[in-house]
Amino acid sequence: MGCFFSKKAKRKRNSEEEQPQQDGEEPKQYSWDKREKVDPKDYMFTGLKDQTVGKLPDKVAGQQFVIQECENCNIYIFDHSATITIDDCTNCRIFLGPVKGSVFFRDCKDCKCVVACQQFRTRDCRRMDVFLCCSTQPIIESSTSMKFGCFQYYYPELALQFKEAGLSILNNTWSNIHDFTPVAGETNWSLLPPDAVIQDFIPLPDSDELKCVRVSADVHKSIIPVTWGQRLKKSDESCLVVFFAGDYTTANARKMIDEMVGKGLSLIQTKEVAMKIEDAKRVFQDNITDLICLLEKGPVVALEFNGEGAVDSCQTVINNTFSGTKVFVSESKESASRDVDNFYNFADMQMGM
């Protein structure tokens, strides 16, 4: 098949091109002419020592950012960005708001960080403490004495920044570390204690410029649900709860988390993922009939709770608080372990695709 051209139109265009621009006539403006010029220096902290610096909300707005050769600094990026690289930094405290792509630490030592990103990687780093939210499996390479905890932070603009970065607050693999260069007989990474307090590692900003950001490190206010991760579970009883897509899915999940944690259960892990009918058949088995139409509306949100009486407690809260909402909850202690394994094995495969 060919393309059609108009000779008449071509002659007209040629005649228009041949006509000189009239005096005083404004030249044509194109979208790329109007695009605001970006100065890389506005998106970089380099060579700083003994300083507190940062970027306020809306001052990075999805651009790439670079931090390099800083020593004994407090650095706060209170905005979403595309990617961030941190090179050759020593004894720094760093907060990084949601990063759409990767965060890469290289040749850093004795740093304490709070980071939210899609991909996290370190190379040639030593003695770092990281409170992390990461959508994919974090990777360390040629790095030692690395410690990880779950992201816990709040300021009013943070939830919207997660959305602008395309990150789900419910997909966090902070504790599932892959050591790209393991050494036999040595452990290059570990998990921070569950009661670790962020402010003991990274102070809240105290400069006049940054104090206007209403920051809280209170675990109960955290945008990201604080999970137990891959630490040894306190009990051999877990329960799987799955909310299906709707107008209040995330809000319902947060309410469920608050209820169960308030009852003394541990939130082990969360996941937001799309499911096909064949996936649901493998995960939910005999309970699929009423779920088919719900799967077509969007991703599901799964929560694993752990503790004595977890199944009974979850069923009670679901019946009393979410009676008008379709929710999957494990039927018994015996089936719950299978439910958790089936769902998260499926979810891990989906996230790895």
Curated annotation (Swiss-Prot):
List residues of the C-CAP/cofactor C-like domain.
27-182
**Region of interest (Disordered), residue spans:** 1-37
Entry PTM: Myristoylated on Gly-2; which may be required for membrane targeting.
Q: Name one GO biological process term.
A: post-Golgi vesicle-mediated transport
Tell me which Pfam families the record gives. TBCC
Q: Where is the lipid attached (N-myristoyl glycine)?
A: G2
Record keyword Nucleotide-binding present: yes
Alphabetized, the UniProt keywords read: Cell membrane, GTP-binding, GTPase activation, Lipoprotein, Membrane, Myristate, Nucleotide-binding, Palmitate
Membrane-topology descriptor: Lipid-anchor
UniProt subcellular location: Cell membrane
Instruction: Specify residue ranges for compositional bias: Basic and acidic residues.
Output: 25-37
List, alphabetically, the InterPro entries matched. C-CAP_CF_C-like, CAP/MinC_C, CAP_C_sf, CARP_motif, NDK-like_dom_sf, Tubulin-bd_cofactor_C_dom, XRP2
* Residues that bind GTP: G101, S102, Q118, Q119, F120, R121
* Record protein name field: Protein XRP2
Gene name for this UniProt entry: rp2
